[in-house]
Amino acid sequence: MVVFLLLKSQFLYGEDFKLRKGTLIIEEGIIKGFTDEHNEREVIEFKGLVIPSLINAHTHIADNSIKDIGINKTLDELVKPPNGLKHRYLTECSDDLLAEGMKLGLGDMREHGIKYFCDFRENGVRGISLLNKALKCYDYPKAIILGRPIKVDKDEIEEVLKVSNGLGLSGANEFKDDELKLIFKIFKKFKEKDDKKLFAIHAAEHRGAVEYSLNKYGMTEVERLIDLKIKPDFIVHGTHLTDNDLELLKENNIPVVACVRANLSFNVGMPKLNELNDNLLVGIGTDNFMANSPSIFKEMDFIYKLYHIEPKDILRMATINNAKILKLENVGLVDEGFKAVFTFIKPTNAILFSKNIIASVVTRCEKGDVVDFSLMENEE
């Protein structure tokens, strides 16, 4: 890691993303503020725009090896464990093919300026091991790996938790009450030793899942989790949350990671993102590689055009909100005390002559506008 450097550029600085030109002091990878006192020969100058590190808060990277396999299939036909089309094909894929697909997926995220991502890693310890193998090829993006046990077994769950950042479950409907309680009980023991461990789960992704839960348990998925005293660190999707679901999430401080492009790819509807953003901490992800590119730029642009949420709020979802949800310390802003992990935007037509630079980043930037560069290759 570079111990001391000066970076001259224009920055989207602080939580309000104020456009600020100047020279940042960076010491041991941490932003110390701006300075006017320096020798020009000591300065690294970047003529584009420096923005906070982009974060993708929900992916399934293994299915990069089976892109577009399920065009016009229903969500259950595609991804419902254990017999969904995705799971059947991934079972047939060799480890080498899966690892190569993951490696290419990592390169794709890197080219899109994504510095961190959270992957729901299926196939137990094997799936985690394959992703870790692929990650050795790059310094960035860094992975938050949420493992998924192959079966509800104490030893299996513990082995997954030992080698991952937590658990990422497919949905409450896949488990009986006692199974959910066992999984969460084991998770809590690990969380007592490491508070950064995460427990996340898909919820209210499609109307059928909500109706199934209501018919079988007399409660929605969210209501059932809370009734079982299971409090996820976040839920994914929330496409069909009821008013009571929203109130329960709010009362229990449970964030939502929305994946709007994926929801429409699978034809399951749209989350009430404006309402969620007004009441909860909201992050964004891109979900399955088989259905979507992992581009957070595309996700932000799509969200703006569908919902007309303030561009500043959308950029927060992709940066500081995602960092908070994933418990990434001192990440997600260009600000004093934060890590010097940035996404670098070239001085291209996407941002030149902009009258609203945040809107231009959110709605115009694409892969070709990113410089594939990191200041902190050896970040811990």
From Swiss-Prot:
For this chain, one GO molecular function annotation is:
hydrolase activity, acting on carbon-nitrogen (but not peptide) bonds
Report the superkingdom from the record.
Archaea
Entry-linked InterPro entries: Amidohydro-rel, Metal-dep_hydrolase_composite, Metal_Hydrolase, MTA/SAH_deaminase
Looking up Pfam families in the UniProt record yields: Amidohydro_1
Fetch the NCBIfam families from UniProt: PRK07213.1
Family assignment? Belongs to the metallo-dependent hydrolases superfamily.
Query: This protein is called what?
Result: Uncharacterized protein MJ0699
- Organism, as annotated: Methanocaldococcus jannaschii (strain ATCC 43067 / DSM 2661 / JAL-1 / JCM 10045 / NBRC 100440)
Classification lineage: Archaea, Methanobacteriati, Methanobacteriota, Methanomada group, Methanococci
